[in-house]
Amino acid sequence: MSVEEKVKKIIMDQLGVSAEEVKPEASFVEDLGADSLDLTELIMAMEEEFGVEIDDDDAQKILKVKDAIDYVSNKQ
């Protein structure tokens, strides 16, 4: 499973959204209905899955699906 597929699966599991909704340009808050707690849980799930630490400044910049995929890909 690729990084992109793993990130998308985490998003689907954490936010309870379908694969069709998890597009690269989708905003976590505006398009996928995430709130601040959802975003925190999403960051924690990605940290655990990929063994990376995402600091608060970086976490605030992860606003869309593509941002999350790019961030994790660059940390691998």
UniProtKB/Swiss-Prot annotation:
A single Gene Ontology CC term: cytosol
Any one Gene Ontology molecular-function term assigned to this protein's record: acyl carrier activity
Modification after translation (UniProt): 4'-phosphopantetheine is transferred from CoA to a specific serine of apo-ACP by AcpS. This modification is essential for activity because fatty acids are bound in thioester linkage to the sulfhydryl of the prosthetic group.
Keyword annotations from UniProtKB, A to Z: Cytoplasm, Fatty acid biosynthesis, Fatty acid metabolism, Lipid biosynthesis, Lipid metabolism, Phosphopantetheine, Phosphoprotein
Entry's family note: Belongs to the acyl carrier protein (ACP) family.
NCBIfam families: acyl_carrier, PRK00982.1-2, PRK00982.1-3, PRK00982.1-4, PRK00982.1-5
Stated name of the protein: Acyl carrier protein
Gene name for this UniProt entry: acpP
